[in-house]
């Protein structure tokens, strides 16, 4: 019984990073919303916060009003930046930020870490989990700053 509860607890505190990358790379608002809900239901961790923040920033571009977009973007940015602050050398979190910074409107002024993040992602690429490495390889094909 204890083993079953432990397994359920572990399952409830994890998520598929491949699913998150699929939602981020797509244009479907409903898949982003579903992933946000799924991550919000999980217990908090640096990974959960970093990915939730990234999803929220991506979702912000699909909202209707500028006020809604900015509020969602700021909420997501705070979550991701908190994770990066707690683990500044984490190339996975830096990759998440790089994807956002390369694609957000310049008016948001969230583009000051692109070169630094690209360098850290390139140097830390081999130590990333396979699902994250796959996302990095896919993203690098269209990124003006990331080369492997």
Question: Model-found features: residue ranges?
Answer:
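Helix-turn-helix repeat elements of alpha-solenoid scaffolds
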Residues: 23-36, 69-77, 110-111
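Bacterial Sec-dependent N-terminal signal peptides
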Residues: 1-19
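Short coil/turn linking the two alpha-helices of tandem helical-hairpin repeats
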Residues: 25, 58-67, 103-108
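Conserved structural position within tetratricopeptide repeats
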Residues: 40-41, 84-85, 123
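Short coil turns that delineate tetratricopeptide repeat
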Residues: 43-44, 88, 126
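Terminal, low-structured helical/coil segments at or just beyond the last alpha-helical repeat
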Residues: 114-148
């Amino acid at each position: 019984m204890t083993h079953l509860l432990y397994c359920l607890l572990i399952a409830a505190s994890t998520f598929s990073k491949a699913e998150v990358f699929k939602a981020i790379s797509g244009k479907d608002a409903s898949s982003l919303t579903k992933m946000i809900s799924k991550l919000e239901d999980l217990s908090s961790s640096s990974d959960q916060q970093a990915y939730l923040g990234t999803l929220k920033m991506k979702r912000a571009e699909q909202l209707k009003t500028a006020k809604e977009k900015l509020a969602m973007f700021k909420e997501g940015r705070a979550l991701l930046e908190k994770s990066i602050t707690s683990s500044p050398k984490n190339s996975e979190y830096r990759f998440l930020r790089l994807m956002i910074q390369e694609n957000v409107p310049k008016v948001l002024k969230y583009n000051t870490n692109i070169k630094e993040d690209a360098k850290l992602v390139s140097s830390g690429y081999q130590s990333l989990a396979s699902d994250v490495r796959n996302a990095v390889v896919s993203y690098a094909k269209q990124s003006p700053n990331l080369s492997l």
